[in-house]
Amino acid sequence: MSGLDDAYPPPRLSGPTAEVDAGPEGPDVGAFFDLDGTLVAGYTAAAQTRDRLRRRDLRMVEFLTIVDLAVQFRLGRRAFETLIESSALTVKGRLAREVDEMGERIFRQSVADLIYPEMRALVRAHQRRGHTVVLSSSALTNQVAPVARYLGIKYPVCNRLVADEQGILTGEIEQPVV
């Protein structure tokens, strides 16, 4: 026969990690994960915005600008770069260390509980097999790095805030925007 008896696609194995566990090993296998809506239920930026509003650490004009840009982006009227660059401006003049600490605190207080257990298991399965695991996100470092550390992901790819020689944020994003 011409292979008609071979099922295509092959039958799926049951369980979220079964296919990874049955697959090849080693760092030549890449596993790429997105952050918001994939590893995490919801959006890490929303958790940060809520926290900053509660602490009165975000001026109303900044908040309204970000909301307006987010709506315009969703409607296809603004580029994503405009939204992410506006977000970076809200921390201009602050110490990078403080913004990173804020990200860690928000992760512990709200984002850690939003990580899907099935996705955590899938990340762990890839790590057990020795795969190269990457967390790729358009979010900012202070949102992505805590999740990557928590999950033991060594390769986060995300947008990074620019700091000057004293560690003060300039309000810019390293180019190119991810």
Where do the model's predicted regions map?
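C-terminal cap/substrate-recognition subdomain and adjoining C-terminal extension
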Residues: M1-A22, G26-D28, E101, R108-V178
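Short glycine-rich loop/turn motifs that provide flexible caps or phosphate-binding loops at active sites
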Residues: D36, L75, K92, S137, ...
